[in-house]
């Protein structure tokens, strides 16, 4: 429990876990954030949808708390990001409403469960690596923007309802099929608009629908 004395403390959360209604929880949060760790075969539209969900939780810009500049741990393949991939993913994050781009981790671990996770500074310990140069380049580009993009809002014509009650009803029951996954179904709707370059807001069931030309439920 955080006391009233800690009024200057910023409260945030991260992730997209099934067990908690994020729209309800976001009302108690100061800032919404999440960690973007796609697999080598994760569709770009899936990443974009999660960005839009994070933005939609408070209808405000969010924070990207973590991404790896290179390879990432705890997946089937700890694949290394190709040249330019991290930069492209970072700009995708900004385009979908993020105010920050942050990395985990700064320096490569020498042990522990994330010893194979990527880092800005590799074991070689200097700046003479492709990954370090790419991060430095991105930092310089973002610095050149100043504060022009901070607090900016996305104007979407489509509202796509993401409802945790339906999420739970579908996946916490024994039917109609274990292969029917809520997020995958929502992504199919989202992907249609993504491929046509149509902006989407991920919204709760009690959102104001009148601002949208189309609401998908």
Residues covered by each model-derived region:
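Short, well-ordered beta-to-alpha junction loops that form the rim of enzyme active sites
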Residues: 13-15, 163
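Carbohydrate-binding surfaces of carbohydrate-active enzymes
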Residues: 8, 26-217
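Single conserved hydrophobic/aromatic residue that forms the stacking wall/gate
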Residues: 1-11
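Distinct, well-ordered alpha-helical segments
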Residues: 15-26
């Amino acid at each position: 429990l955080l006391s009233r004395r800690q009024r200057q403390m910023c409260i945030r959360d991260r992730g997209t876990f099934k067990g908690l209604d994020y729209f309800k929880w976001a009302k108690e949060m100061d800032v919404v954030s999440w960690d973007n760790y796609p697999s080598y075969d994760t569709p770009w539209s899936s990443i974009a949808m999660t960005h839009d969900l994070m933005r939609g939780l408070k209808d405000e810009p969010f924070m990207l708390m973590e991404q790896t500049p290179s390879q990432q741990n705890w997946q089937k393949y700890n694949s290394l990001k190709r040249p330019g991939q991290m930069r492209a993913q970072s700009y995708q994050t900004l385009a979908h409403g993020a105010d920050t781009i942050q990395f985990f981790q700064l320096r490569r671990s020498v042990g522990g469960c994330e010893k194979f996770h990527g880092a800005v500074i590799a074991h070689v310990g200097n700046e003479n690596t492709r990954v370090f140069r790419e991060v430095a380049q991105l930092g310089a580009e973002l610095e050149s923007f100043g504060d022009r993009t901070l607090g900016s809002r996305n104007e979407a014509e489509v509202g796509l309802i993401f409802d945790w009650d339906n999420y739970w009803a579908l996946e916490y029951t024994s039917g109609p099929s274990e292969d029917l996954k809520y997020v995958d179904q929502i992504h199919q709707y989202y992907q249609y608009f993504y491929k046509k370059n149509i902006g989407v807001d991920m919204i709760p069931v009690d959102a104001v629908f009148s601002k949208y030309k189309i609401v998908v439920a």
